[in-house]
């Protein structure tokens, strides 16, 4: 069976790390993120992918000590792999950014470019990103992939 690779957007990691979500409105986002990530971690044929762009977003939103702890977790976990963008990704992201009249951040365009080149499934809750990304790649919310 082929390996399935999921590129998890920073918003999903932030849901988990910051315990985001309102339990009075159903299952909190952090719990859905935790369940999704655990499903991948305990699978035989799935992995999580991240990039420096995800790390930059996390660094901006997390306290320094928490960020360092999470980076260490990423590096030590065998089911979580790091990928680097190349010139092709930057070019495609610039093209996407222009097509969208700069309504989507360059980092989000880079997420799409990486997923396209590496055939990754983008996992996010960002509705604007989902709307545009689905024209180019497979994109899902974590709750849609939990049975």
Located regions from the model:
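Short, well-structured N-terminal submotif of metal-dependent ribonuclease cores
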Residues: 1-49, 62-69
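Acidic, PIN/NYN-like endoribonuclease modules and their adjacent C-terminal/linker elements
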Residues: 1-5, 25, 40, 82, ...
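Alpha-helix capping/helix-boundary segments
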Residues: 12-13, 54, 89, 111, ...
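Residue-level signal for well-ordered alpha-helical positions
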Residues: 19-20, 61, 96, 135-136
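Helix-adjacent hinge/juxtasegments
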Residues: 65-72, 80-83
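Active-site neighborhoods of divalent-metal-dependent phosphate/nucleic-acid chemistry enzymes
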Residues: 80-125
